[in-house]
Regions:
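C-terminal interaction surface of TIR/SEFIR-family domains
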Residues: 3, 112-171
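Short beta-alpha junction loops
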Residues: 53, 79-80, 104-119, 145
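Hydrophobic/aromatic beta-strand patches that form the interior of the parallel beta-sheet core
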Residues: 74, 107-111, 139
Length: 171
């Protein structure tokens, strides 16, 4: 989608409300890749998504439509699916969008925060379910700096793939 002189690609950030520092790290990674790699090529990764769980619950139809319009989806987790399995539903929607050739979704990434001392069986089962998925890339991280670094690499890959496919605004 070309607007304002840039070829724009939406990146949906999905993070439970207790992971706002991680969400900020995701936004910072996208911003740095934009400034250093994407914008010189007239490409722009645009982060979208709501910051609070309640906002998502209150606007489910709009959030779902937002996911459907995105090219990339980043899901950050630590210990559960959020209230009423809210983030499980978003993750499954993103995977369905990626598998639908009529939609722009290209990749779904799960970022799983380390929980080395976790012993709760329900949380361990949740983490195993995520780790057993083979249909999406899994990034494991132990702090926000590590998350940001890994996402900068991923976003850089996306920019290079967009450029290789002929994306960007040509002068």
């Amino acid at each position: 989608m070309i607007q304002h002189g840039f070829d724009m690609y939406r990146v949906y950030l999905s993070t439970p409300g207790d992971l706002l520092r991680e969400q900020d790290a995701c936004r910072a990674a996208i911003s740095e890749v934009n400034a250093n790699q994407a914008m010189p090529l007239k490409i722009l990764l645009v982060s979208v998504g709501l910051r609070e769980d309640g906002q998502i619950v209150g606007f489910r139809a709009a959030v779902s439509e937002n996911v459907r319009q995105c090219t990339y989806f980043i899901q950050v987790f630590e210990d559960d699916w959020g209230p009423n399995n809210l983030y499980r539903k978003l993750l499954h929607l993103a995977a369905e969008c990626r598998d639908d050739s009529n939609l722009p979704m290209r990749e779904v990434i799960v970022c799983l925060k380390a929980a080395p001392h976790e012993t709760d069986p329900a949380i361990l089962a949740f983490r195993k379910e995520l780790e057993d998925r083979e249909d999406m890339r899994m990034l494991r991280f132990n702090n926000v700096e590590n998350l940001k670094s890994q996402l900068m690499d991923v976003c850089g890959e996306w920019v290079r793939a967009i450029e290789a496919a002929g994306g960007g605004v040509k002068d």
